């Protein structure tokens, strides 16, 4: 008898008979009067995942991309500086020399971005490392969206240029300002 009562209780239609809105029905709950809601930001429509796009993978035909898949602008580099400060500088240091605060606390030192091997690495290499991790570095794919990964890479390139820049690298109009400064 008790078993029959337990089984009968499990036969309720709660999941079938639940309060819900039908697609495109009217709704008094939402201010716009529609039950259909816009997709959450970052939603990918079925069949539209850009898994083969260089922007999202950092690769073309399996090889790291040699050039940025988006225009590099001052705004992109500034965004990269902001993101680098948050995600990268604790280990890699503010100058990209591998002397971040975690190293001073006894953790393993990451490589400097200023060694020839990394100065010559294509942007796709950095994208892959940020996405998948490398050595002691964990993947940042879940924390840093692709747009910000490219921004960070642009900033790393700016850091690399800044550490070995000469007067000949300065545009002529700015060079005159520097030479005339006291």
Task: Identify the role of each PLM range.
Residues 73-97, 110, 125-126, 131-132, ...:
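Sequence/structural segment immediately N-terminal to covalent heme-attachment motifs in c-type
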Residues 22, 117-123, 138-182:
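Flexible coil segments in periplasmic/lumen-exposed cytochrome c-class electron-transfer proteins
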Residues 36-42, 118-133, 140:
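Short Fe-S-cluster ligation motifs
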Residues 7, 84, 114:
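Conserved Rossmann-like nucleotide-binding pocket used by diverse enzymes
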């Amino acid at each position: 008898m008790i078993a029959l009562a337990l089984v009968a209780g499990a036969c309720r239609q709660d999941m079938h008979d639940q309060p819900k809105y039908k697609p495109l029905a009217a709704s008094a709950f939402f201010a716009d009067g529609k039950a259909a809601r816009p997709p959450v930001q970052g939603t990918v429509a079925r069949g539209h995942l850009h898994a083969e796009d260089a922007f999202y993978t950092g690769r073309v035909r399996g090889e790291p991309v040699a050039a940025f898949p988006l225009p590099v602008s001052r705004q992109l580099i500034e965004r990269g500086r902001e993101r680098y400060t948050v995600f990268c500088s604790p280990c890699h240091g503010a100058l990209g020399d591998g002397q971040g605060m975690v190293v001073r606390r006894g953790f393993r030192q990451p490589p400097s971005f200023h060694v020839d091997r990394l100065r010559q690495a294509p942007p796709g290499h950095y994208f892959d490392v940020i996405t998948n991790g490398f050595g002691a570095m964990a993947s940042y794919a879940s924390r840093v969206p692709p747009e910000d990964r490219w921004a960070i890479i642009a900033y790393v390139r700016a850091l690399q240029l800044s550490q070995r820049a000469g007067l000949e690298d300065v545009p002529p109009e700015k060079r005159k300002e520097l030479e005339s400064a006291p």
